């Protein structure tokens, strides 16, 4: 009863297509793809910024202990 079979998935997919239509689903898929690309680009840009901060940071002076 709780199993998900291929026929159940096909029925759900057919209902989604009937409810939203193919044009709306195509638009939704394009928007989702654009959002994912933007997210990945932002993550890569953030990583590059962090690396620049680490590499280009000011080094601390070495202190010697005087007795």
From Swiss-Prot:
GO-annotated biological processes: protein transport by the Tat complex
Subcellular location, record wording: Cell inner membrane
InterPro entries: TatA/B/E, TatA/E, TatE
Cited function: Part of the twin-arginine translocation (Tat) system that transports large folded proteins containing a characteristic twin-arginine motif in their signal peptide across membranes. TatE shares overlapping functions with TatA.
Topological relation to the membrane, as annotated: Single-pass membrane protein
GO cellular component term of the entry, any: TAT protein transport complex
Residue spans crossing the bilayer: 4-21
Family: Belongs to the TatA/E family. TatE subfamily.
Protein's UniProt name: Probable Sec-independent protein translocase protein TatE
Keywords linked to the UniProt accession: Cell inner membrane, Cell membrane, Membrane, Protein transport, Translocation, Transmembrane, Transmembrane helix, Transport
Primary location class: membrane
GO MF annotation: an example: protein transmembrane transporter activity
């Amino acid at each position: 009863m709780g199993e998900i079979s291929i026929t159940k998935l096909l029925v759900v997919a057919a209902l989604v297509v009937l409810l939203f239509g193919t044009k709306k689903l195509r638009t939704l898929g394009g928007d989702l793809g654009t959002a994912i690309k933007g997210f990945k680009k932002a993550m890569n840009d953030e990583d590059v910024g962090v690396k620049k901060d680490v590499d280009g940071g000011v080094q601390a002076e070495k202190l010697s202990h005087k007795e």
